[in-house]
From Swiss-Prot:
Gene designation per UniProt: M
Organism this protein belongs to: Influenza A virus (strain A/Duck/Czechoslovakia/1956 H4N6)
This protein's domain notes: Cytoplasmic tail plays an important role in virion assembly and morphogenesis.
Gene Ontology CC: host cell plasma membrane; membrane; virion membrane
Name of the protein: Matrix protein 2
Record's keyword terms, sorted: Disulfide bond, Host cell membrane, Host membrane, Host-virus interaction, Hydrogen ion transport, Inhibition of host autophagy by virus, Ion channel, Ion transport, Lipoprotein, Membrane, Palmitate, Phosphoprotein, Signal-anchor, Transmembrane, Transmembrane helix, Transport, Viral ion channel, Virion
A UniProt-annotated Pfam family: Flu_M2
Annotated site location: Essential for channel activity, possibly by being protonated during channel activation, and by forming the channel gate and the selective filter: 37
Annotated family: Belongs to the influenza viruses matrix protein M2 family.
Keyword Ion transport recorded: yes
Main location class: virion
């Protein structure tokens, strides 16, 4: 008998996993981690457009204005708006100092 047929032949107990009734904490922890990983993977595949769109736009909000006086905030907003207000078909070159 070849090795292949020996591997494919079911055992006396059938195709059961020998750890199915185990109460070993390591087996239980591995099972929980595996189930959580599967759930997270399924959610990621279902909602990946929404998740990554939120992350992408969340990172592009700009610098924090916490602790900056209101006059400086307004000046910054005005500069940003002026950089965006251009005719269609033209590019804006912003040089950083």
């Amino acid at each position: 008998m070849s090795l292949l047929t020996e591997v494919e032949t079911p055992t006396r107990n059938g195709w059961e996993c020998r750890y199915s009734g185990s109460s070993d904490p390591l087996v239980i922890a591995a099972s929980i981690i595996g189930i959580l990983h599967l759930i997270l993977w399924i959610l990621d595949r279902l909602f990946f457009k929404c998740i990554y769109r939120c992350l992408k736009h969340g990172l592009k909000r700009g610098p924090s204005t916490e602790g900056v006086p209101e006059s400086m905030r307004e000046e910054y907003r005005q500069e940003q708006q002026n950089a965006v207000d251009v005719d269609d078909g033209h590019f804006v070159n912003i040089e950083l100092e």
